Amino acid sequence: MSVSGELSVANGKSTPPKSSISDYIALLKPRVMSLVVFTALVGLMVSPVPINPWYGFLAIICIAVGGGGAGALNMWYDADIDAVMERTKKRPIPMGKISPPKAFIFGMVLSLLSVLVMGSFINWFAAFFLAFTIFFYVVIYTIWLKRITPQNIVIGGASGAFPPMIGWAVTTGAVSLDSFLLFLIIFMWTPPHFWALSLFSSLDYEAAGIPMMPNVRGEYSTKKQILFYTVLMVLCATAPCFTGLGGVFYGIFSTILGIIFIYFAYRLWKANTHDETILMAKKTFFFSLLYLAAVFGALLIESLVRYFIDL
């Protein structure tokens, strides 16, 4: 403890920790934002309409800022449960580094700014789509679904699946079947990803009173549904090959990754003991991160190769 902190305690006063730039960055959920930005970038790059690089860069910044604003609003509302969970109790609001009102204002300013800039400089369709995504994540998922149903991340997961459609809308001013397929891949990926996490974090969620699938339906039902959604996800990931969005490289690569993902999900489903379940849940969770990045990365690589071949 610092000298000033000791004097404050001695005088019967506690000095709240000072906030820093890193605390405000933490409010943005940078790890989540990085996935949002990457999938949005892929949606933008694989769309059939070219865009000025500077406008594309500005659009991605808007999506990142909007995603960060939504993350801050999520932390503002979830401050009570974040303080209970081991995984989240060191976030800025539970630690007292940023007050809830400041977090709320920060999140609202970023959210509104991102939408206004997107509409003013890119197009209003993409801006309204971004606004709807922020609303869906904060209101539909965080405020409404998260604390009342084990299907929270199934329905609420749509908010995390919208970014590639926003990226697509940036260049085209519309949505299409191909952009919807990108949405479906992430939408089906979300349950296996988060339910695997909830299997080895079930005590944390239980302490916070969040009705995640393992706490409500049990381990076996959760593992079975992880396998079910994994198969659906892999099928959705092959669909771009039939529309022309994905080529031979993407088709082979995504299929191999999909088989590996199904293998992990199957091993998790067949796990006989709790310890084995936890081990396989962790492996499935971490592979899911690699899978989504690799599948979207393959689409991006193919798009860039086609671009340079056509030059």
UniProtKB/Swiss-Prot annotation:
A Pfam match is UbiA
What's its membrane topology?
Answer: Multi-pass membrane protein
Q: Where in the cell is it found?
A: Cell inner membrane
Q: Which residues cross the membrane?
A: 32-52, 53-73, 104-124, 125-145, 153-173, 180-200, 224-244, 245-265, 285-305
User: Which GO cellular component terms, listed alphabetically, does the Swiss-Prot or TrEMBL entry include?
Assistant: plasma membrane
Q: Provide this UniProt record's keywords sorted from A to Z.
A: Cell inner membrane, Cell membrane, Heme biosynthesis, Membrane, Transferase, Transmembrane, Transmembrane helix
Q: Does the keyword Translocase apply?
A: no
Q: CDD domains attached here?
A: PT_UbiA_Cox10
- Anything else the record notes? Carbon 2 of the heme B porphyrin ring is defined according to the Fischer nomenclature.
Family from the record? Belongs to the UbiA prenyltransferase family. Protoheme IX farnesyltransferase subfamily.
Q: What is known about what this protein does?
A: Converts heme B (protoheme IX) to heme O by substitution of the vinyl group on carbon 2 of heme B porphyrin ring with a hydroxyethyl farnesyl side group.
HAMAP family linked to this entry: CyoE_CtaB
Please state what the protein is called: Protoheme IX farnesyltransferase
Q: Which organism is it from?
A: Bartonella tribocorum (strain CIP 105476 / IBS 506)
